[in-house]
Amino acid sequence: YERVPHYRDLTPEDEWALLERGLNRVTDTCIPEHEAFRRLQKHIYKIWKDADDKGERYFPHEFMYKMLLSGVLEEYYEIDLKDSWMYAAAEKNLPIIVPGWEDSTMGNIFASYVIKGDLKASTMKSGIEYMTSLADWYPKNSANGIGFFQIGGGIAGDFPICVVPMLYQDMEM
């Protein structure tokens, strides 16, 4: 990963130079494409394809859990698994709500396989299904109070706080 602290000042030429070096910029951080996403792609595709062939459907985080727990990424680990929050979540099968996943690099890769006809879009559960799942989970777990660990803003921040008004106002609970 490469930091770009002055990313707002980049010219189109600067942006192109980063891209030519194989770096995908996400705000102030450049992610080396072949060191991250392409490394995962062959492994996650097999898991997507297996589910697709069986007519099974999962959420994006469930597919990631399957990949992590399968051990196919062990050769790439750069930290001890005991220090990985994602691996700990996978081991405990914690619910992770990933709204807007379709607008991510992995979402784009999944969409490319759908466009090529290799996978069905319905294999991946949608954002609406995340909301309905959260709406089902919330009343079952909120009696003693609940907490969320939020990563990111925008839709990631708005999504969990929208479920309560939806339950009260739209569902009239």
Protein language model annotation of sequence segments:
Residues 1-173:
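Conserved catalytic alpha/beta core of Sir2/sirtuin-type deacylases, generalized to analogous enzyme cores
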